[in-house]
Design a protein with these regions (language model features):
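Single conserved hydrophobic/aromatic residue that forms the stacking wall/gate
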Residues: 1-9, 230-237
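Membrane-embedded alpha-helical bundles of multi-pass transporters/translocases
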Residues: 2-6, 10-224
């Protein structure tokens, strides 16, 4: 059956499975901050204007991150890029966490670094996912590009739902008072904690599967040359 074929492809394409797991955490960390952005800016920082600035930073930063990744990955590889940008994002989140929600310059500076890193990591994940297409074809004899793309879309929708539930839980369980301009300190601290440390921790979890990811650029190039040979599955790997 079609489902059995898909499970077989998944089981034989370990790099794809690792990338999908990493993609889940990347999306969750990014969406968690995005969904909480309004509450964080309005209540922790006291003005919706901060959200406007942060959205502009996100728009520019994501593009800059993608461009930096495109250049840097040619020199140090995609996997190392992911480690680098995840580390930088963690550092920037730690700086914002310990600085608190009182210094706008720190907020904008750390958000700029984090957004550039998120942009680079997301492009990195997508690029590595595309590499698994040839790997899967080499392993199974089937080029399942459509299945990989549809699975990624399904994962994105699921993560959106989970992130929405998580933010709703944070708002509901911390004592948030609707329509109050001033929230209790524990609510503000919870928003700050989730916005900084929790989102950074999730990005770190996204890196863990990459420790087991063995499909390097060199190996991918070899497979691109070999999987069309008469006996592609006789090649070790």
């Amino acid at each position: 059956s079609r489902r059995q074929r898909q499970m077989c492809i998944r089981d034989r394409n370990k790099p794809l499975l690792l990338i999908q797991i990493s993609n889940i955490f990347c999306l969750l960390g990014m969406m968690l901050k995005g969904y909480l952005n309004y509450y964080y800016c309005v209540y922790n920082w006291g003005s919706l204007g901060y959200m406007t600035v942060l959205n502009l930073i996100n728009l520019v930063g994501m593009v800059v991150g993608a461009l930096i990744f495109t250049f840097l990955s040619q020199h140090i590889g995609k996997k190392n890029c992911m480690f680098l940008f995840a580390g930088l994002m963690t550092i920037s989140s730690l700086v914002l966490y310990f600085a608190g929600y009182h210094n706008a310059i720190v907020l904008f500076a750390t958000s700029s670094v984090s957004t550039v890193c998120v942009g680079a990591v997301m492009v990195c994940v997508n690029a590595m996912m595309m590499d698994t297409i040839e790997y899967g074809e080499w392993k199974t004899g089937q080029r399942n590009e459509a299945m990989i793309t549809s699975t990624r879309c399904f994962v994105t929708k699921c993560v959106m739902a989970v992130a929405g539930i998580a933010v709703a839980a944070v708002i509901g369980l911390t004592g948030y008072i609707p329509q109050e301009t001033v929230q209790p300190v524990n609510v503000l601290n919870s928003f700050h904690f989730v916005y900084t440390l929790v989102s950074a921790g999730i990005i770190i979890l996204a890196v863990v599967p990459m420790l087991f990811y063995k499909l390097t650029e060199k190996r991918h190039a070899e497979i691109c040359l070999l999987y069309t040979s008469p006996s592609p599955r006789d090649i070790s790997g």
